[in-house]
Regions:
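A short acidic, Gly/Pro-enriched loop at the edge of an enzyme's catalytic core
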Residues: 97-109
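Residues that mark the start of a beta-strand
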Residues: 41-42, 142
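A short SAM/SAH-binding and catalytic strip from SAM-dependent methyltransferases
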Residues: 108-128
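A short glycine-rich, Lys/Arg-flanked "PGG" loop and its adjoining helix->strand segment in the class I
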Residues: 127-143
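Conserved class I S-adenosyl-L-methionine
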Residues: 1-39, 146-171
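Conserved Class I S-adenosyl-L-methionine
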Residues: 50, 181-230
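Class I SAM-dependent methyltransferase SAM/SAH-binding core
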Residues: 44-46, 50-98
């Protein structure tokens, strides 16, 4: 089975098939609106992947720029933007810690299930990598703007849990001044077969088996929302 890192590099279409099923109740957009207005905002989406957040936000904001280190993910993102008929978007390969943008050029930075990888993929230097990222956010955001992060608190869980591989990341967010709350972002699939197949593809056999055992056409997921004003 491919790792998640390998999936991001090579499996854009299959990954999008999964992500398109997420948050069937629309809680992500609702949570964002509770934190900050969206209208007339310039938004940067970091680790945008296939455009889960960027494509959702584009109809509501002035301009959105999607950044990701994977050209494969951005290929799908661009296809979705083009199909939408919208023109207020741009998608570019870039690292969270070094964005190809001017100082004080955005009103909102969002990132879904992505900034955490700076900690996960850099176990020996996770704190300094996160500090580099936060410094870059302070550079690119206008005064009194917001960073909003969405991170996992358990897929296949009805109640939120702290994931072991993010044990350093969660308290770091608290230490640097992020507020947080919990939302549900459940996946709603077209069939039980699809639910099992896509869950197994990305999350692994343990969750795939759980979906099959519980006959989950709707896969529960808890997501943490962290936000900070700059």
């Amino acid at each position: 089975m491919p790792t998640q890192e390998e999936i991001y590099k090579t499996e854009g279409d299959k990954y999008e098939a999964l992500i398109a099923r997420e948050d069937h109740q629309g809680n992500i957009l609702r949570a964002l609106r509770e934190i900050t207005p969206l209208e007339n905002r310039v938004v940067y989406d970091l680790g945008a992947g296939t455009g889960r957040l960027a494509c959702m936000l584009a109809p509501h904001v002035r301009h959105v720029r999607a950044f990701d280190i994977s050209e494969e993910m951005l290929r799908v993102c661009r296809e979705k933007f083009t199909a939408s008929g919208l023109s207020n978007w741009q998608a570019d390969v870039a690292d969270h810690r070094q964005l190809p943008v001017e100082d004080a050029s955005a009103d909102l930075v969002v990132s879904g299930w992505s900034v955490a990888y700076l900690a996960v993929w850099n176990p020996d230097s996770w704190r300094s990598e996160l500090e580099k990222w936060l410094g870059e956010m302070k550079r690119v955001l206008r005064p009194n703007s917001y960073i909003v992060l969405f991170e996992s608190l358990g897929t296949g869980n009805e109640l939120p849990i702290k994931l072991e591989h993010l044990r350093d990341y969660y308290p770091w967010l608290d230490q640097v001044g992020f507020q947080n709350k919990v939302i549900r972002t459940d996946y709603k699939f077209d069939s039980l077969d699809e639910a099992e197949y896509l869950s197994r593809f990305f999350f692994g056999d343990e969750l795939g088996d759980k979906v099959k055992k519980n006959n989950w056409g709707i896969l529960p997921e808890c997501t943490g929302v962290w936000w900070k004003q700059i």
